[in-house]
UniProtKB/Swiss-Prot annotation:
Gene Ontology molecular function, alphabetical: double-stranded RNA binding; metal ion binding; ribonuclease III activity; rRNA binding
SUPFAM superfamilies the record matches: dsRNA-binding domain-like, RNase III domain-like
Gene expressing this chain: rnc
Cofactor field: Mg(2+)
Protein name as annotated: Ribonuclease 3
């Protein structure tokens, strides 16, 4: 095994029995042959489960919507990319020549995806207990810094953080109607989210309020919140 990969194993805190799993987890789809997308899918599911389990135990009084918002904050791409940079993961990625030239080893989404793929690889290599231990160790700083105050953000911010945690495009807002006199207007705003087949609507006395209402409706439609949180 490459000494460099041995160094990465020490940083991750896991020594792979099956080195091919580790190499596959570091292989981007731009590289020829098999890639890490299936491992990323598996790792994403494990990450969300472990994070959800930890939050459930840590915040026994939190409501479902609050737990969902905390998890979205915990597993968003930005957080994972910061962890990946701490492991200097970009140095170990297998990328196609085009991605290398464009700086793909620094790109947030590629780093976050590779870290999720490594979680999936650790699970296949050593089981759920090992994967849980690594995830909780990596996220310990973020977990310790979370409070229920973090769930008191406005709907637009919560929606943006949820979508970022899924590596999705940010929502788009558009004013579709304005009614009433200049001193007493009502704005109608549409919110378009890539994960939803239909746009959500919001109405309010200002564009800002209407956008917040539309974002709240999108969170409910996505199943992130139930309208009672």
């Amino acid at each position: 095994m490459s000494p460099n990969l041995s160094r990465l194993e020490r940083k991750l805190g896991h020594s792979f029995k099956d080195q091919d799993l580790m190499i596959l987890a570091l292989t981007h789809r731009s590289f020829a042959g098999r890639n890490n997308e299936r491992l990323e899918f598996l790792g994403d599911a494990i990450l969300n489960f472990v994070a959800g389990e930890a939050l459930f135990e840590r915040f026994p009084q939190a409501r479902e919507g609050q737990l969902s918002r905390l998890r979205a904050r915990l597993v968003k791409g930005e957080t994972l990319a910061v962890l990946a940079r701490g492991f200097e993961l970009g140095e170990y990625l297998r990328l196609g020549s085009g991605e290398l030239k464009s700086g793909g080893f620094r790109r947030e989404s590629i780093l976050a995806d590779a870290l999720e793929a490594l979680i999936g690889a650790i699970y296949l290599d050593a089981g759920m207990d090992a994967a849980r231990e690594r995830v909780l160790d990596w996220l310990s700083g973020e977990l310790d810094g979370l409070t229920l105050i973090d769930t008191n953000k406005d709907p637009k911010t919560r929606l943006q953080e949820f979508l970022q945690s899924r590596a999705c495009e940010l929502p788009r807002y558009e004013v579709v109607d304005i009614q009433g006199e200049p001193h007493c207007r009502t704005f109608m705003v549409e919110c378009q989210v890539a994960l939803l087949n239909e746009k959500t609507l919001g109405q309010g006395g200002s564009r800002r309020i209407a956008e917040q209402v539309a974002a709240a409706a999108a969170l409910i439609a996505l199943g992130v919140e139930n309208g009672n949180d």
